[in-house]
Amino acid sequence: MTTEPTQNPAFRLFGRSQGKPLSARQQRLVDEFLPRIGLPDDGPIDPAALMPDRRRQALEIGFGGGEHLVAQAEANPQTGFIGIEPFLNGVAKALTAIDAAGLGNVRLARADAREILPRFETASLDQIFLLFPDPWHKKRHAKRRFVQQSTRDEFARLLKPGGRLRIATDVKSYADHCMVELSGDDRFIWQARTADDWTLPPADHITTRYETKNLGDCAPVFMDFLRV
């Protein structure tokens, strides 16, 4: 397991991959702990084989500092969680929390998820979380948004029938973008029946400090889709 984000010329990673220097403890966790709980450097990825004693498998794309990922793993010990995040400081924070909690049901990758998702086995996940991704407000940057046809196809391939995709955002244009991308795809069924279903956090949602900062232009929107 490498500690550098994967480099594929077909993809360009937008935004920073590292902020301030890591502390000595964080660097030690990146050097020593990350290889132990990391994903394989190459070849297919089978989440069930990585964590065979877990009943379900979930993925969080862009986990930031790992607050949601770690809390979900603590609350759901029978689920194996995989987190993918390119930002080194976020990975280091997540490693610190995982180590402190002694969690055995989390695996991490410091990578661009667009590069690593094709390596996952088909129908290998029960749930995918994409929470408050970079909205790329400017129209000329719209193609940088994570939710595109190519990633939608990957979501459909990776989720088991009956699996769930949850996207959350506090940016109206991004919510509209996601609905356009997914609502017309007959592989997914939007689960909202009333306004409360998408304007209130789902019962199993874990609110993070980032979410409470209200950095977007609307209240948080939660879009849950069922894989048919």
Swiss-Prot record:
Top EC class, one word: transferase
The molecular function terms of the Gene Ontology recorded here are:
tRNA (guanine(46)-N7)-methyltransferase activity
Kindly list the positions annotated as binding S-adenosyl-L-methionine: E60, E85, D112, D134
Catalyzed reactions? guanosine(46) in tRNA + S-adenosyl-L-methionine = N(7)-methylguanosine(46) in tRNA + S-adenosyl-L-homocysteine
**What PROSITE patterns does the entry give?**
SAM_MT_TRMB (PS51625)
Q: Look up the record and report any one GO term of the cellular component aspect.
A: tRNA methyltransferase complex
Give the keywords, sorted: Methyltransferase, S-adenosyl-L-methionine, Transferase, tRNA processing
Pathway given for this chain reads: tRNA modification; N(7)-methylguanine-tRNA biosynthesis
In which residues is substrate bound?
Answer: K138, D170, T208, R209, Y210, E211
Instruction: Quote the catalytic residue positions.
Output: D134
Enzyme Commission numbers on file: 2.1.1.33
Superkingdom as given in the UniProt entry:
Bacteria
This chain's function reads: Catalyzes the formation of N(7)-methylguanine at position 46 (m7G46) in tRNA.
Q: Which family does it belong to?
A: Belongs to the class I-like SAM-binding methyltransferase superfamily. TrmB family.
Q: State the protein's name.
A: tRNA (guanine-N(7)-)-methyltransferase
Report the source organism: Maricaulis maris (strain MCS10) (Caulobacter maris)
Highest classification ranks of the organism: Bacteria, Pseudomonadati, Pseudomonadota, Alphaproteobacteria, Maricaulales
